[in-house]
């Protein structure tokens, strides 16, 4: 059997289970992209490296295998740093493949010359440059580093002379003989002695306020965490992208009384979440100043970070599923009859009050639509188990977090750890590519829409049927009622016709001003997605909003 270097590399990726690649082609990687397609790998050509990098990044999260990004070198790689950073911060597996100058042109000012290996190696888990002699080793190492330990980013540099190398690799069958073709993350269990100490602490404080905080790092461990919550009747609070790991519909979910739940928590089990800005660094005044945080994580660097409580010494390192199972078994062994009292009465009352307030807001009618009215209309139209909802934008995303509960994991994606704007269409493309059988609904603010609107054409061309809802308040945070004179930095053009942008790019266009129009258009868009694999853009005109000072609401204001 003979094959070229490029063919061998593409075949190797396919044998490792790589089925989808996002990117933008150019010199010298066009031939590599063609070879990937010839070997059964789906290539999704995007319109901008930033959006492509976000798509590949999210694919690594939503599909449970490394996302793969193929781009040109130099400026193409620089444009893709957004998604690389996104995967690093979110701890998602990503393989970046970029073209580079021929070896003979290095240090001569070659075409798009950039020493990409040196640029990236201090920050990524692995970087390597392909030669005809090291294809198997570099590919295996890159993919293995992506998934082992804390998931992250690997980089493979593909010089132009590698792609142009046409000499057959005689008898190159090493993929089946020397290196394993199935890459599985290794996991380890927790320290049994620490599990015993955690159980003793819980039972010693069983009359105190106990809370489980669930992060997206525990997304693979839904079964084990549901068992813990339900067996011992423990209240829980999911972080935004952890919604659905335990059903939001559970009576033990305290999300609707988040602020109060944090303030009264005494013992806090943190499962796969970081004590960062999303959890207010684990400090007062958001939290009870006496709270004891016990962190469970597969990443040892997370343990003890921002944790100044006595629980830092009890942090559990290991696979979260194995650790939670060990906790359940040890709790049962030490006290087989114990069951926590559940959600406190004061929290139940606050949940009821806030849910009533939310429903009242959704039913209050004004001269123009607002976020609450729109979300209250869309919620019953969304089939939870067959829908992935991506939300992006400041108010758009914040209000969506309380308006769209879910009972299934990996059904809610948003700006995440980095609070990144620009992820919306890339994430939506990844979700549809990974799960074509599901509805993918993207709800964006009008500012967020502008970051990657051209990717609508990608969705149309690749038949990645999306339902895109633009919450158009003509501004960032809020619009301006009076557009005369100098406009503030937050202002955008009033009532832009984003629906017509979608139409120009091949999507169905809907322009919405009323609840009845919204209901009809959304249902029509979903049907077009399911039956004809068509993308739709629904431009919803909403009120500009309050003209008030902009503050970091997540950090400074109570949440529902």
Swiss-Prot record:
Entry text on domains: Peroxisomal targeting signal 1 (PTS1) is a tripeptide located at the C-terminus of more than 95% of all peroxisomal matrix proteins. The prototypical PTS1 is the terminal tripeptide SKL (serine-lysine-leucine) but the consensus of PTS1 is defined as [S/A/H/C/E/P/Q/V] [K/R/H/Q] [L/F]. However, this description of the PTS1 consensus must probably be expanded beyond the terminal tripeptide.
Name the record gives this protein: 2-hydroxyacyl-CoA lyase
Gene symbol of the encoding locus: PXP1
A single GO BP: fatty acid alpha-oxidation
Note on how the cofactor is bound: Binds 1 Mg(2+) ion per subunit.
Cellular-component GO terms for this entry: cytoplasm; peroxisomal matrix; peroxisome
CDD domains with a match to the protein in the record: TPP_BZL_OCoD_HPCL, TPP_PYR_POX_like
Role summary: Catalyzes a carbon-carbon cleavage reaction; cleaves a 2-hydroxy-3-methylacyl-CoA into formyl-CoA and a 2-methyl-branched fatty aldehyde.
Motif (Peroxisomal target signal 1 (PTS1)): 558-560
A Pfam family annotated for this UniProt entry: TPP_enzyme_C
Lyase in keyword set: yes
Cofactor: Mg(2+); thiamine diphosphate
Inactivation phenotype: Does not affect growth on oleate.
Enzyme Commission number: 4.1.2.63
Binding-site residues, Mg(2+): 446, 473
Binding residue positions for thiamine diphosphate: 49
Family indicated by similarity: Belongs to the TPP enzyme family.
Keywords: Cytoplasm, Lyase, Magnesium, Metal-binding, Peroxisome, Thiamine pyrophosphate
Superkingdom of this protein's organism: Eukaryota
Subcellular location: Cytoplasm; Peroxisome matrix
Catalytic reaction list: an (R)-2-hydroxy-long-chain-fatty acyl-CoA = a long-chain fatty aldehyde + formyl-CoA; a 2-hydroxy-3-methyl fatty acyl-CoA = a 2-methyl-branched fatty aldehyde + formyl-CoA
Record InterPro entries: DHS-like_NAD/FAD-binding_dom, HACL1-like, THDP-binding, Thiamin_PyroP_enz_cen_dom, Thiamin_PyroP_enz_TPP-bd_dom, TPP-bd_CS, TPP_enzyme_TPP-bd
Enzyme class: lyase
